[in-house]
Amino acid sequence: MGLLILGIESSCDETGVALVRSIGAARPRLLAHALHSQVQMHQAYGGVVPELASRDHIRRVLPLTTQVLRASGQRLADVDVLAYTRGPGLAGALLVGAGLACALAAALGKPVLGVHHLEGHLLSPFLSADPPEFPFVALLVSGGHTQLMRVDGVGRYALLGETIDDAAGEAFDKSAKLMGLGYPGGPALARLAEQGSATAFGLPRPLLHSGDLDFSFAGLKTAVLTQVRKLGDQLPARKADLAASTEAAIVQVLVKKTLAALRQTGLRRIVVAGGVGANRRLRQQLDAACADSGLRVHYPELALCTDNGAMIALAAAMRLQAGVQQAGTDYAFDVLPRWPLAASA
């Protein structure tokens, strides 16, 4: 029967729970997952309020666990390992998932395992119908992180480049806020961009020709603010064009740096993960560039691009399979709000 692993994600504003079954060296299989997003709750504040996020995780995580067990036809007593997001993320939010996982594990006498949030994103395409093979270059791109990693196997990660200021997702969200598009801004900006011209505004592409694999998006955000102020009363009529131009600037940098990472490493496979990985323009441009060069690009299923419990259960299963980490029965836990991925290997 292999191992039945319950994964809990609570690092920010999504509460996710999932069950994965791992049998021998076979690819782990997702049995069920459930997710609650706090987007509606945080909309009134224009962003995530950490205290409210933690309280909502407390309300949601146990009912979601019950929902997943029922959907999979499993009992809590059948679970072999409990996995949770140890970091990075909001400290209070992380403590909710860690606390529940360790409490359940202690009550059941089962082992527990803390997982790196970004490793969950990085490995999430292994749940897709077209999973990648090692080694590959990973573009981890979300509201809080923008990194390029060389991935030679589970737990074998080398940082190639990262943002020196704002993450790509943050650039989407803050630009959207400047345009009055509400929260969450990234998806709203991407939808509006489909109606506009990507060449209407000559926005900067920071570090595009820097020769390294680092990113910078703070200057782009400032340029968007400048355009918003220049447009004044004309902003409503030009908003779609500004959204399209902003999206095009972010995507061009992401695509060029990712292809440069492939050239630098000599690898021919890309994994794109994180919330921004769902962006249509990013997928279209990467797919086109890879098709022209005979390269392979892999994405998670769209439903698994945002934070979710499935990626945490999967990462735990793959770490156990690879023998890079053992689940333990020391139920004293801590969380790591700041935790470089390479340091978790």
UniProtKB/Swiss-Prot annotation:
GO BP term (any one): tRNA threonylcarbamoyladenosine modification
Binding sites annotated in the UniProt record for substrate: L140, V141, S142, G143, G144, D173, G186, N279
Pfam families referenced in this protein's UniProt entry, alphabetically: TsaD
EC nos: 2.3.1.234
Named cofactor requirement(s): Fe(2+)
SUPFAM superfamilies attached to this UniProt entry: Actin-like ATPase domain
CDD domains according to UniProt: ASKHA_NBD_TsaD_bac
Record's keyword annotation contains Transferase: yes
GO cellular component: cytoplasm
The keyword Transferase appears for this protein: yes
Gene3D superfamilies per record: 3.30.420.40
Keywords: Acyltransferase, Cytoplasm, Iron, Metal-binding, Transferase, tRNA processing
Binding site for Fe cation: H117, H121, D307
InterPro entries to which the protein is assigned, alphabetical: ATPase_NBD (IPR043129), Gcp-like_dom (IPR000905), KAE1/TsaD (IPR017861), Peptidase_M22_CS (IPR017860), TsaD (IPR022450)
Annotated GO MF terms: iron ion binding; N(6)-L-threonylcarbamoyladenine synthase activity
Cofactor note: Binds 1 Fe(2+) ion per subunit.
Disulfide bonds, paired cysteine numbers: none
Entry's localization field: Cytoplasm
Catalytically driven reaction(s): L-threonylcarbamoyladenylate + adenosine(37) in tRNA = N(6)-L-threonylcarbamoyladenosine(37) in tRNA + AMP + H(+)
Function: Required for the formation of a threonylcarbamoyl group on adenosine at position 37 (t(6)A37) in tRNAs that read codons beginning with adenine. Is involved in the transfer of the threonylcarbamoyl moiety of threonylcarbamoyl-AMP (TC-AMP) to the N6 group of A37, together with TsaE and TsaB. TsaD likely plays a direct catalytic role in this reaction.
NCBIfam families to which the protein is assigned, alphabetical: gcp_kae1 (TIGR00329), T6A_TsaD_YgjD (TIGR03723)
PANTHER family: TRNA N6-ADENOSINE THREONYLCARBAMOYLTRANSFERASE, TRNA N6-ADENOSINE THREONYLCARBAMOYLTRANSFERASE, MITOCHONDRIAL
Family from the record: Belongs to the KAE1 / TsaD family.
Protein name, UniProt field: tRNA N6-adenosine threonylcarbamoyltransferase
Lineage: Bacteria, Pseudomonadati, Pseudomonadota, Betaproteobacteria, Burkholderiales
